[in-house]
Amino acid sequence: CRASVSCQSAEELANMRLGALLYTLGYGGAMLALCMLVPLFVSIVGGHWAHARNFTMGLTLTTFVSGALIISGLPTRRLPARNIDLLAVMLLFWFVLPILASIPLTSAIQVRSFMAGYFEAVSSLTTSGGGVIIYPQFEDAPILVWRALLGWLGGLWTLVFAVAVLAPFAIGGLSLVGSPLLQHDEDAALSSRLGRPMRVIFPYYLALTILGVIGMAAGGNGFVSSFCMALSGISGTGTS
């Protein structure tokens, strides 16, 4: 009887931890949805209706899925996070969210399948700089803007994960002992452990991005080119 109760408690705790992971993953999806608004606007203004349709589909699905994840994890969102939970959510951000991010990429000329779009999205969000879009000059502005935004968002996530996930383990020699970025309560939730460094890093990241766009535009480049080059530069993806 005790063993049965213990197994039931362990199962309930596992479900609670899964809920906390899904809740945090939902916020990552919400960030993707917000970023999709930019290339959707570019598609409408430029008359790229095929891209506008894909971005509308992607935005709708991403918003729905993200909302469902957040709602499903609400009851367990305050569960204290373990270090393994931080590592798990980092992997989910990098390899699950690209499924949603790849939907608009399927209308790109050089993306021949959904798996190719997924690979492109993973490459951008992990800031690896790879991908299947080798000749950006053949792609329309909405695709280039979306690829730049994915790399930019991936760069932001990489900085946050470096502080919240890698630094506590001193992975790669990274150590921020005593830094206010690592300060948190012992019973801090997963969303709180990631949210604190996000709130500190994001304003500087955004400010540098805006300065980069202004600098590129001042050099005589068009707005879309300046936007894409600035975002790829700040994120470190190196795409154009």
PLM regions and their residue ranges:
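Membrane-proximal intracellular helices of multi-pass ion channels
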Residues: 1-240
